[in-house]
Amino acid sequence: MKSFRNHKRIALFTALLILGFSTTVFAHSRDKDRWDNKYDTEVYLFGENPIPFLVKNVHLLPKGKVLDLAMGEGRNGVYLATQGFDVIGLDISATGLKKSHKLAERNNVTIETQVVDLESFTLAPNTYDVILCTYYMQRDLFKQFQSALKPGGMIVVETYNIDYLKYARFSRKWALDTNELLDIFKGMRVIRYQDYDNGKEAYSSIIAQKP
């Protein structure tokens, strides 16, 4: 009887593991399909121009290898490529990355890309001169940035903060708390930081350097 109960427990535990894995795979597949559908248009969903914070501060960044996380259609990564950086972009959407290459061609530069599910991705240590991540919120990924940078490397992060909830229907978990970027990257030297609110949208931006 005891052996039978143990077998039942093992079977139940295995079933739960399989169910959890299947649910996770389904969720990630659904994210991929959702973004592929969004990007499946001739128009660039977020435009072709880089974010102003990046343009204003590009002269501060060390030249070298850039990792553009959640690259999307490539507006920021392609801009950095035009400024002489070696850019590799990661995103869950193959459709978005295909548009990134088209944008790069129009700007007479080349980029590398890879379709990756960032929710299960681990950054290699001491690899990048710059890590760029805009309008993608994954706190556990942010915590890998410092170790993934080469000494003296920099991160550029910009995304919506809690004040954005005043202007749009937006999940609270995807919005930064007050000073959250400063807290996450407190082990790094802050080069630039801003909180922006124009009455229509609100976001926070940071450039920080690994010692």
Protein language model regions, located:
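Conserved SAM-binding motif I beta-strand of class I
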Residues: 86-91
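A short acidic, Gly/Pro-enriched loop at the edge of an enzyme's catalytic core
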Residues: 121-130
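Conserved beta-strand signature within the Rossmann-like core of class I S-adenosyl-L-methionine
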Residues: 153-164
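Conserved SAM-binding strand-loop segment of SAM-dependent methyltransferases
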Residues: 107-118
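A short, conserved alpha-helix within the catalytic core of class I
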Residues: 137-149
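Core SAM-dependent methyltransferase catalytic element
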Residues: 196-211
